[in-house]
Amino acid sequence: MARPAAVRVLWALLLPLLLGSARGLRNASQRTFTIDYSHNRFLKDGQPFRYISGSIHYSRVPRFYWKDRLLKMKMAGLNAIQTYVPWNFHEPQPGQYQFSGEQDVEYFIKLAHELGLLVILRPGPYICAEWDMGGLPAWLLLKESIILRSSDPDYLAAVDKWLGVLLPKMKPLLYQNGGPIITMQVENEYGSYFTCDYDYLRFLQKLFHHHLGNDVLLFTTDGANEKFLQCGALQGLYATVDFGPGANITAAFQIQRKSEPKGPLVNSEFYTGWLDHWGQPHSTVRTEVVASSLHDILAHGANVNLYMFIGGTNFAYWNGANMPYQAQPTSYDYDAPLSEAGDLTEKYFALREVIRKFEKVPEGFIPPSTPKFAYGKVALKKLKTVEEALNVLCPPGPINSLYPLTFIQVKQYFGFVMYRTTLPQDCSDPTPLSSPLSGVHDRAYVSVDGVPQGVMERSNVITLNITGKAGATLDLLVENMGRVNYGRYINDFKGLISNLTLGSSILTNWMIFPLNTEDAVRSHLGGWHGPNNGRHDKTFAHRSSNYTLPAFYMGNFSIPSGIPDLPQDTFIQFPGWTKGQVWINGFNLGRYWPARGPQMTLFVPRHILVTSTPNTIMVLELEHAPCGDSGPEVCTVEFVDRPVIGAPPTPGHPPPDLSHRDLRLDYV
C-alpha cells in the first residue's frame, strides 16, 4: 500500500503546478485584440482600448539608438509605435535575406515590447515612405514589363516568396501569441495607385491569413478621399484613413465611415511635418497647428498614429523621389517631434501635453537629447579620379554593348555606372550631346578625354554641348539619385535608358562599368598610388572652371583624448564642395548637395566613430571640389555640433506651392 500513498503525495505536489500551467495557457489564449463594432472601438483583452501611436522606421535609425528613441516615444505618452518593413532592405538580391544587425526587425519589435509599447506593423509589400522604390526591390524590374502592385504573376510569385519568409517571423510576435503586434497593414495607400486590382488585394489578404492565422487584425490605409477608398479598401480588411493638421477632421472621418460604417475611427498617418526635396525649402509645420489638430482628433475619440514621431536618416542610397522627378535628401527629419538626431523639440513637449489631457502619461525621467561635439575642420587630399580608379571600382572590367544598358540590365541596383564610348566625329565646335527621350536617369557627369564638359540631368538638362576630336573617349558617370517611391512611375529604371545622340548620330559601342563603390571605399581605392588606367598622366586644362572630374578625396581625424564621453554625435558640413557621397570608416552616410540645399549638414551618429585609431573620411565629389587640380592642394570638411537642414533654396530652384500638402496626388 506504500505505492498508492506515494502516488497521492506526488499528485498533491503536482496538482497546483498543473493548475497553474493551465491558467497560464488560458491567460495566453485570452490575449486578444479585436474590433467592437457595436461600440466603435478596439478591445484589448476584452477591454476598451485606444491607441496613440508614433511612426519610427528602424531602417532610418541606427540600431545603436533604437532603445533611446523608443523610450522617448513612450515617455511622450504613446502606447504604440508604427513601423514599415522595407522589402529591399531585407532582400537586396533575389533569395538573399538579411535579418541581422541594422536589419534585425525581430529584435526591434521585441525591444519595443520590453519597453511596454505595442506595435502596428506595415509590412507592405509596398510601403511608399519616401524610401527607394517604395521598398520594392529593384531586381523586380529584371522583367521589364512587370506591373508592380498588381496580379502580374511574376510580381505575385516574388511577393509570395518574400512574405513567406517575413510573416512566419512575425507570427510569434503577434499580440495574441504573446508579442506586441496588435494590427498589421496590408499594402499601403493602394487606392492612390492606378492598377485598382482587387484580385491583388485578395491575394495579399489570403497570404497574410495563411501565414498569420485568421484572428490577426488586418487593416488598410488610404487618403481621406472617397476615390482612394474605392480602390484601397476590401471587405475583411479594416479601412483607415490618413490626413494632416488643418484638415476637416469631421469630414475626413466621414470618408472613413463610408467604408466602415461601424468600428473605431483611425487616422493611420497624422502628419507632424512633411518631406523634403533637394532644391526646395525644408518643410515645417507649426507646433501649435499640429497640437491643436491632435487635440481635436483625440477629442473625437479616434485612434491616431503620428507620422513621423522621429524621421531619421536616409543613409547610403535609400532615399526615394517623386514625380516630376525630384529626389529626397539624406535627412528625413520631417520636422517631427524628435529630430533626425533624436533630440527633444518644442513639438515633442507640446504633443506630450496634449496627450496628457486624454491619457495617462508616464512619469519619470525622459532621456535627454544626446550630446553633440564639434570636432572641427579635417583636411582632405585628392586620392584618385573615378577614371583612375576604374580597375578598383570595377575589377571584372566593362560590359560591352552596342547600345547603352540600364542599371538593372547590368544588375547594378544602386550608386553609379560609368558609360564609355568614343566620339565618332570631330567636335571642334560645340556639338550637342543629347538624350532626346530624357533617358539620363538621373544625372550624368560628362567628360571627353578627361576634360569635364558638364552635367546632364533627368527632365532638366537633356542636351549638353561638348568638344573633342574624333576617337576621343567620351565618359558619362551616371548617378542613380533614388527611385520614385509613389505613383504610377515606380517602375523607375536607372542609367542611360535610351540612346544618346551626338549631333544627328546615335552613339554606339559602349563600354559599361558598374562601380562597386562600397568595396572600393573600404580598401581606400588601393591607396594613394596605383595605375591611373593608362590614359591621363597630367591635369588637363578644364573646359569649364565650374566642373572638375568626379574624384575621391580622403582624410583622417582623431577623437580628442582626455574629454569624457567621447565620441559623441556630430554633423559634417562641406564648405566649398558641390555634390557627392561621403563615407566615414566605410559607413555610407549618404548624399551631400550644398550647392542645391536645403540640407547642408549630414548627421554622424557616434557609433560609427572610433577612438582607438584615426577615423577615415572618404568623399566622392561629383562636380567641383574646392581643392586639387588648379586649386589648393588641401580642402576641408568640418564637424559641427548643430545641424543645418533648412538653408534657403538656391537660385533656379524656386520654392514649391505647398498650399495643399499632398503634392504627390497629382502623379498617381
Curated annotation (Swiss-Prot):
Keyword terms, alphabetized: Disulfide bond, Glycoprotein, Glycosidase, Hydrolase, Lysosome, Signal
Glycosylation-annotated residues: N248, N465, N499, N546, N556
Active site: E189 (proton donor), E269 (nucleophile)
Propeptide, residue positions: 25-29
PROSITE patterns (UniProt xref): GLYCOSYL_HYDROL_F35 (PS01182)
Binding site for substrate: Y84, E130, N188, Y334
Subcellular location: Lysosome
Recorded GO MF terms: beta-galactosidase activity; protein homodimerization activity
Family: Belongs to the glycosyl hydrolase 35 family.
Function comment: Cleaves beta-linked terminal galactosyl residues from gangliosides, glycoproteins, and glycosaminoglycans.
Name recorded for this polypeptide: Beta-galactosidase
Species for this entry: Canis lupus familiaris (Dog)
Lineage, uppermost ranks: Eukaryota, Metazoa, Chordata, Craniata, Vertebrata
